[in-house]
């Protein structure tokens, strides 16, 4: 995981909401099919908490389809704010993740704070498990009876659960 930058921007000219964009640069290994999870955390002397991301401006994380939008279905939800993606579209490239969140920088102006980016390289099994949970909790079509509920992935024979693992790389920057 490379450099991390912070950019503050207003969501539009008529809205007072400020968005913080944290950009995190990483390089994907071209010789393997890789699966990732990314988390953004806010850290100061009083708290260490996972933040929800606004995924509209990050193609690797935006799972909402035009059909979902047209019918007013909810946004795709990520279990535990663990935003998962694979390397199919970025294989072997250096990529900049655009992690947008509602601004905490103006609230933290009295404290030194940092955004911490945790990039996890996860096993295919862990990715499938998280994806199945995300798909199940984000399936608005099943909620209204128009689609079948998807089962949760398990690789345990004769039981439930998953045997999987991950490797983490973290970088933080104080602001």
Regions found by a protein language model. Give the residues of each.
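A sequence/structural signal for flexible, mid-protein segments enriched
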Residues: 1-175
């Amino acid at each position: 995981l490379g450099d991390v930058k912070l950019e503050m921007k207003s969501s539009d000219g008529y809205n007072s909401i400020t968005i913080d964009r944290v950009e995190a640069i990483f390089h994907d290994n071209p010789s393997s099919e890789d699966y990732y999870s990314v988390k953004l955390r806010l850290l100061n002397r009083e708290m260490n908490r996972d933040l929800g991301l606004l995924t509209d401006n990050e193609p690797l994380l935006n799972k909402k389809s035009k059909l979902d939008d047209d019918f007013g279905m909810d946004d795709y939800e990520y279990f535990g704010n663990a935003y998962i993606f694979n390397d199919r579209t970025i294989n072997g490239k250096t990529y900049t993740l655009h992690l947008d969140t509602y601004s905490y920088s103006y609230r933290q102006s009295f404290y030194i704070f940092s955004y911490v980016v945790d990039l996890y390289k996860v096993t295919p099994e862990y990715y499938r498990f998280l994806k199945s949970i995300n798909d199940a909790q984000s399936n608005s079509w099943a909620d209204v009876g128009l689609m079948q509920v998807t089962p949760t992935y398990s690789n345990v024979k004769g039981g439930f659960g998953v045997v999987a693992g991950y490797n983490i790389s973290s970088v933080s920057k104080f602001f």
